[in-house]
């Protein structure tokens, strides 16, 4: 009997919309990477740093359609990813500027986001960043991103007991398990869209 073929490794580009060092949204993404290493074979989460991207300005594009080096490097990482995990903080009921800037740069010219699966996690006050998730989904329609619908994860970061330590690392085991469920859903959805399962 032949051994079962190994599942391909799905590369998840984790993009945090907050640039703050101790960002709770960054903490969710770090926890996601750890969960994958510990308990989800075939899924690898790689952090994609957006802090070096210039503000979108089409004057920075070259006549032949090129981009500044930091933008080219970012676009390459987006193209190489099989799917995305966004850590989306909420500012003024919407998406944070750094995340919107990254989305815009990778959509210029050839849309690097097109036809790829994605999931969103968020942490914050009030609704835990839930409103930013809905705005990100709206932007994703134009970008042709395919978001998983369930499960949703919007962490009310300031409610007791504490969910994060002073460095922004997730310390809540229940939320860690919920992240695992998001990742398993993203993995299954990605395999389905790629027709690899």
From Swiss-Prot:
Its EC number is 1.6.5.2. Its cofactor is FMN. It catalyses: a quinone + NADH + H(+) = a quinol + NAD(+); a quinone + NADPH + H(+) = a quinol + NADP(+). GO terms for cellular component: cytosol. Keywords: Flavoprotein, FMN, NAD, NADP, Oxidoreductase. GO terms for molecular function: FMN binding; NADH:ubiquinone reductase (non-electrogenic) activity; NADPH dehydrogenase (quinone) activity. The enzyme apparently serves as a quinone reductase in connection with conjugation reactions of hydroquinones involved in detoxification pathways. Homotetramer. Belongs to the SsuE family. This is Probable NADPH:quinone oxidoreductase 1. It comes from Oryza sativa subsp. japonica (Rice).
């Amino acid at each position: 009997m032949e051994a079962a073929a190994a599942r391909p490794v799905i590369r998840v580009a984790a993009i945090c919309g907050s640039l703050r060092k101790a960002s709770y949204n960054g903490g969710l993404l770090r926890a996601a990477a750890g969960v994958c290493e510990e308990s989800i074979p075939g899924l690898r989460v790689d952090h994609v740093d957006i802090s070096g991207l210039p503000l979108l300005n089409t004057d920075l594009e070259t006549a032949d359609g090129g981009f500044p080096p930091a933008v080219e490097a970012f676009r390459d990482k987006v193209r190489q990813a099989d799917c995305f995990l966004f850590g989306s903080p909420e500012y003024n009921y919407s998406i944070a500027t750094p995340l919107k800037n990254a989305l815009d740069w990778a959509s210029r010219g050839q849309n690097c986001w097109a036809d790829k699966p994605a999931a969103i996690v968020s942490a914050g006050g009030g609704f835990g960043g839930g409103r930013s998730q809905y705005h990100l989904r709206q932007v994703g329609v134009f970008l042709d991103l395919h978001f998983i619908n369930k499960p949703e994860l919007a962490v009310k970061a300031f409610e007791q007991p504490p969910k994060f330590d002073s460095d922004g690392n997730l310390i809540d085991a229940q939320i860690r398990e919920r992240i695992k469920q998001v990742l398993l859903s993203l993995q299954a959805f990605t395999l389905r869209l790629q027709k690899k399962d």
